[in-house]
Amino acid sequence: MLSVQPDTKPKGCAGCNRKIKDRYLLKALDKYWHEDCLKCACCDCRLGEVGSTLYTKANLILCRRDYLRLFGVTGNCAACSKLIPAFEMVMRAKDNVYHLDCFACQLCNQRFCVGDKFFLKNNMILCQTDYEEGLMKEGYAPQVR
């Protein structure tokens, strides 16, 4: 957890070991930091500017993106079966996870926008038109076009 606190008396910075004379300081991992000293070990972004959360593992202090990139759980896209990096934005339908580019009707390839209605039938993502056409067929066995 990261917190910004007004400085009441000078404290030593865990990053540079110098006294913190700034008006504000950061407290993270039960240590005090200059705003410029608390950085992600990978991308060097200032963690006080990124948000109020930081991640630690293997003696590294990391931003969310780099933590997920290095240690996050990845999975495979339900449509293309390719690996989805842990930091990538995804779409979900029940237990299935998809790349944003793969989240489309699996019969006509119509891409979905936020708020569009879609259907999951026999583990396939379908647009409303293809879903309704499939319901009209006996036994519903869609053929990929």
Curated annotation (Swiss-Prot):
Disulfide bond positions: none
Pfam families (UniProt xref): LIM
PROSITE patterns: LIM_DOMAIN_1 (PS00478), LIM_DOMAIN_2 (PS50023)
Keywords carried by this UniProt record: LIM domain, Metal-binding, Repeat, Transcription, Transcription regulation, Zinc
Keyword Metal-binding carried by entry: yes
GO cellular component: cytoplasm; nucleus
Any one GO molecular-function label of the UniProt entry: transcription coactivator activity
Protein name per Swiss-Prot or TrEMBL: LIM domain only protein 3
